[in-house]
């Protein structure tokens, strides 16, 4: 934590908390597990008391009805709206759903927190209008 904090405090852009990793348990016995990169990133941002979390994916924004004729890209969405969209099944498990859930967890930490889901390509021209902004209610 101290190393990452030092980089952030010196204006470095820190890219870390990728997937994989080794699961650790208190029992001392091996377990099968996956360290989810989205939730790991959210937890790191929370510990560092960040106000903004950017989660990268393969598309510019999150969408309702993804891949269908009535696909709708979202510029900004709040927590209540996202809960509804999750209940309606708009986000694929193991794909966009964990990204959305991690973003929601981060925004719930503080009403001032903002999460952005976007693509690496769009991040190159990042102007805080890129991607989907997830905000508090």
Residue ranges and their predicted role:
Residues 1-137:
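C-terminal catalytic "cap/lid" subdomain
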């Amino acid at each position: 934590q101290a190393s990452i904090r030092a980089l952030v405090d010196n204006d470095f852009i820190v890219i870390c908390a990728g997937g994989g990793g080794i699961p650790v348990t208190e029992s001392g016995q091996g377990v099968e597990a996956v360290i989810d990169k989205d939730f790991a990133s959210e937890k790191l941002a929370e510990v560092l008391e960040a106000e903004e979390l950017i989660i990268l994916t393969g598309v510019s924004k999150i969408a309702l009805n993804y891949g269908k004729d009535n696909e709708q890209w979202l510029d900004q969405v709040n927590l209540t709206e996202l809960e509804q969209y999750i209940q309606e099944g708009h986000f694929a498990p193991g794909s966009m759903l964990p990204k959305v859930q991690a973003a929601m967890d981060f925004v719930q930490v503080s009403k001032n927190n903002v999460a952005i889901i976007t693509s690496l390509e769009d991040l190159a021209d990042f102007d805080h209008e890129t991607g989907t902004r997830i905000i508090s209610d």
